[in-house]
Amino acid sequence: MSLTTAPVPGQAWAFRCDVSSAHNLLIAAIGIQLALMLPSLAAVVVDDRLLNGVSVWSKPLKFQASLIMMLGTLAILLPLIESAAKNGWGVWIACLVAAMTASGEILYITLQAARGRASHFNSETPIETLAYGLMGIGAALLVLSSLAIGLYLLMRPAADAPRGLQLGGGWGLVLGSILTLVTAFALGSGRIGGPGHWVGGVHSDADGLFLFGWSRSGGDLRVAHFFATHVMQALPILGVLLGAIAPRLMIPGLLAGGVFSIAVVVGTFVQAIMGRPFF
């Protein structure tokens, strides 16, 4: 941890976090994702082992790409928080939690792929049962750290922060985090359609939707979870576009975007629990 010191009355030294260290935590975590993505890309070509009908390396690659986007979003939005809050312990701890949980999650997922073992819904051994439980806790903490940074963006924005990106980023992180937690709980509980992401249909990803792998024979809880997670990117992009094209419509536009995002997540979730494929 990088710290700076500054004298205050009545004390020899006081400590405060250096915002660059918080930002560097996120960059380091992105570096870990990239470092694992390169061999995963090579492995998917040369390793013909399958899990649930698709390459064992399919899941690590999807998670590596998703976590790069999530951590990158936090890194981009972090400078929009006003200086006092940005240099405080709250933001630093949120970034530390995000970096550690994202790194731990992807290391385990990649390790399990290398072993040819499932990382999710795997209780075949005591260690894997424990690891899956810890991964669930880590994923929740990762999302909560994003929620915290979103609240900082909304409540303590920098005076010179671009309004569209600041509002879109703040609401995107808050709304996206809440929706992600709800869909992740439903997905991970195993109470809808049994353990796994399938609801009805063939319990295999072999003939899944191109690129995403979503079931085409029944419901798939991953669809709603995907849209929930990427609200964190969609609303900031919408905010930037509205700020550049129609500043007066920024707030109503973001509200409409938020309502639409909720509708998409709820709609695809209901579709999945009814056992219907996305396409």
Which residues does each PLM region occupy?
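Membrane-interfacial catalytic/cofactor-binding modules of polytopic membrane enzymes
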Residues: 188-231
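Membrane-water interface at loop-to-transmembrane-helix junctions
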Residues: 160-171, 220-224
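Aromatic-rich transmembrane-lumenal/periplasmic boundary elements in polytopic membrane proteins
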Residues: 165-199
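Short, Lys/Arg-rich, polar N-terminal cytosolic tail immediately upstream
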Residues: 1-22
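Interfacial helix-loop-helix junctions of multi-pass membrane proteins
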Residues: 44-55, 114-124, 193-194, 269-279
